[in-house]
Amino acid sequence: MSTESMIRDVELAEEALPKKTGGPQGSRRCLFLSLFSFLIVAGATTLFCLLHFGVIGPQREEFPRDLSLISPLAQAVRSSSRTPSDKPVAHVVANPQAEGQLQWLNRRANALLANGVELRDNQLVVPSEGLYLIYSQVLFKGQGCPSTHVLLTHTISRIAVSYQTKVNLLSAIKSPCQRETPEGAEAKPWYEPIYLGGVFQLEKGDRLSAEINRPDYLDFAESGQVYFGIIAL
């Protein structure tokens, strides 16, 4: 084989081999991809560190999560406090000068009759039908215990328009003395409060009374101890 034919075979073999895509342009592309991958990894690592150490992230809540529920409720309370109520309400107190009886008064400090409620014949007259909270408190006071058993009762009664009969709505009985004070022993004072309260459906014109069986034991030493009232709901 001549030298020329050998050179020609080598050239043909080189042409048959696939050409590489390297060179300066391929090197730059690989360098760019490597740099881009490094930046992505570095950025992800930095973000993880910032989140882990609390440098960035969701801000802490300074208010309750249910603030959206509290705000309307607070606004409703504020608006209702600014708006005068037209619901019937009454709060009467005992007359400390009435001896031997429980007499209710509305022309005293911290007493009121509003929106149609009347105090007539020592009874509260309901101005409209509806649900009412009825309440009353009395305070009894004594000195020592007599030989006879002491029973103290407190009752709230209703005389309805539909049936003219007194019916007890709430009632309580208490006995402050368990045994008689021995003769010659010191007669110690005792106190016995009774509170009554409940919700009832009332009709227009119903009459309500709060009564006791032993007015001689009532304690009027402080104001606000004996009272009677209704609140429309």
Curated annotation (Swiss-Prot):
Lipid-modified sites (N6-myristoyl lysine): 19-20
Modified sites of kind Phosphoserine: 2
Gene Ontology CC: cell surface; external side of plasma membrane; extracellular region; extracellular space; membrane raft; neuronal cell body; phagocytic cup; plasma membrane
Record-annotated site: Cleavage: 35-36, 39-40, 49-52, 76-77
Membrane topology recorded in Swiss-Prot or TrEMBL: Single-pass type II membrane protein
SMART domains reported for this sequence: TNF (SM00207)
Extracellular topological segments: 57-233
Membrane-traversing stretches: 36-56
Name recorded for this polypeptide: Tumor necrosis factor
The species this protein was found in: Homo sapiens
Gene (UniProt): TNF
